[in-house]
Amino acid sequence: MELNVKTLEGKDAGKVSLSDEIFGLEPREDILARVIRWQLAKKQQGTHKAKGRAEVSRTGAKMYKQKGTGRARHHSARAPQFRGGGKAHGPVVRSHEHDLPKKVRALGLRHALSAKIKADDVIVIDNLVAAEAKTKALASAFETLGLTNALFIGGAELDGNFKLAAQNIPNIDVLPIQGINVYDIVRRGKLVLSKAAVEALEERFK
């Protein structure tokens, strides 16, 4: 398939050919969901903690004598049913990360790219370069292209001026090709690829 290439000013800059093996798949929501869940689980902190009955600071002495009170038989005041007692099966510090096969992760990226193509949400820009690091000028260029919520993927090296100018614009993310991922593609409205990014993707999945 072919897509028109544009400049940041909105002018035509030729066409680019896209591989059907990367951009032409029928998107599978189950694959996308698995990859996104894996990504978010990897990011989750896991610093949650609640003290159990062995950890709370409280006497371990028997609350009252076993017999003769008419009350229920209790031992430690650290038991979870009492106020100030330990939490039963509470959260512990742990990693939420889980394994996902490399082939599934790669397939997820191809399905995410295909989903954006199918929704007509992919724009190819010849070069992500800004003459100066001015947010106002870049925001105006994005407005011309109709980009209010977008992920920009550049080549292996991002232009410093472009990156600085874009980082203060709301709902705009800029990543080098090494950082392309399913979650960021799906969470943004438009996917903007530089020609260098398209070439790198073709090389990666060849």
From Swiss-Prot:
GO terms for molecular function: rRNA binding; structural constituent of ribosome. Keywords: Ribonucleoprotein, Ribosomal protein, RNA-binding, rRNA-binding. One of its GO terms (biological process) is translation. Transmembrane segments: none annotated. Gene3D superfamilies: 3.40.1370.10. Residues 63-97 are annotated as: Disordered. Residues 64-77 have a biased composition (Basic residues). It holds the Pfam family Ribosomal_L4. GO terms for cellular component: ribonucleoprotein complex; ribosome. Belongs to the universal ribosomal protein uL4 family. Part of the 50S ribosomal subunit. One of the primary rRNA binding proteins, this protein initially binds near the 5'-end of the 23S rRNA. It is important during the early stages of 50S assembly. It makes multiple contacts with different domains of the 23S rRNA in the assembled 50S subunit and ribosome. Forms part of the polypeptide exit tunnel. NCBIfam families: rplD_bact. HAMAP family: Ribosomal_uL4_B. This is Large ribosomal subunit protein uL4.
